[in-house]
């Protein structure tokens, strides 16, 4: 159990002392700082530290709690050669000029829907069909009703229940449980996730129309298998990437980031919205584009 008597490393103190403003990377900053705090403080203490550091900032409801819970599965391990301050520099800044040019050129949600080889508006594919075709019928899948209720089970053991889950890890797992940073067994950890099968691109700002244009543009660079509405304010674009290393995927992720993508989905065990499922408030995870033909 992390102890609040342990002094924070200087780089963590530096991070906490200089949060960006809303619109300047605050959402990503919360995730990054929470990630390095996990081995040093309890969940409640991390929330308190982030609340204190961002006092007066226009935070979204639940934003800090979500950052803390979402970052735990890829928490920093003390002893790793990591300098979050310098590591952050490798991520490109959002290029608003380039982003606007793409938005003006590439179309909107109507165009994204029209690009789908499988027309999903009248007869949408079921969650079971999508997962069978994209993830495979003989694999281990990690899913959950909430961020904190992850389970990893054989595909057939999930049969008929996946649409009741809010979240899924977009790559198969290799075993039922792995070890977290503090050595505890967990169904969702870097210790039991397999090679990336999909890299999911999510944007935390911009309208649905703008996000659609960005996904259309990115689909010219990589195979877009699925576009799913989060039931809130974003679209999750599933890009097929089986067989590619993180080094090979990094330029694409950086390009997506420069156009407004969140960094959090780079973490291979980050939960994303279940295709065809429902948000906890009942809002559907509508499938806008479904292209199983790109999956080999």
State what each model feature region is:
Residues 139-140, 225-226, 236, 271:
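Beta-sheet entry/capping signal
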Residues 264-278:
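Acidic carboxylate-rich catalytic motifs and surrounding loops in phosphoryl-/glycosyl-chemistry enzymes
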Residues 225-232, 263-267:
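Short beta-strand
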């Amino acid at each position: 159990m992390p102890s609040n008597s342990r002094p924070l490393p200087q780089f963590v103190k530096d991070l906490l002392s200089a949060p960006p403003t809303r619109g300047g990377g605050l959402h990503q900053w919360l995730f990054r700082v929470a990630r390095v705090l996990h081995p040093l403080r309890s969940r409640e203490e991390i929330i308190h530290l982030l609340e204190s550091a961002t006092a007066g900032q226009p935070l979204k409801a639940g934003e800090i709690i979500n950052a803390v819970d979402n970052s735990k599965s890829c928490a920093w391990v003390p002893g790793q050669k990591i300098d979050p301050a310098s590591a952050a520099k490798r991520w490109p800044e959002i290029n608003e000029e380039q982003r606007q040019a793409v938005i003006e050129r590439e179309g909107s949600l109507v165009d994204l829907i029209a690009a789908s080889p499988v027309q999903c508006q009248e007869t949408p594919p079921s969650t079971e069909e999508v997962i069978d075709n994209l993830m495979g019928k003989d694999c281990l899948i990690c899913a959950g009703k909430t961020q904190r209720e992850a389970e990893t089970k054989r595909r057939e053991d999930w049969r008929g229940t996946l649409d009741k889950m809010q979240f899924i890890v977009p790559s198969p797992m290799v075993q039922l449980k792995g070890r977290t940073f503090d050595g505890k067994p967990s169904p969702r950890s870097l210790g039991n996730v397999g090679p990336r099968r999909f890299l999911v691109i999510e944007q935390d700002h911009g309208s649905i129309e703008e996000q659609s244009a960005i996904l259309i543009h990115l689909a010219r660079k990589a195979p877009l298998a699925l576009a799913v509405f989060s039931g809130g304010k974003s679209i999750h674009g599933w890009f097929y990437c089986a067989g590619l290393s993180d080094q090979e995927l990094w330029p694409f992720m950086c390009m997506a980031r420069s156009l407004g993508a969140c960094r959090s989905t780079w973490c291979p065990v980050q939960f994303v919205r279940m295709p065809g499922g429902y948000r906890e408030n009942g809002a559907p995870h509508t499938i806008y584009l479904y292209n199983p033909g790109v999956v080999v």
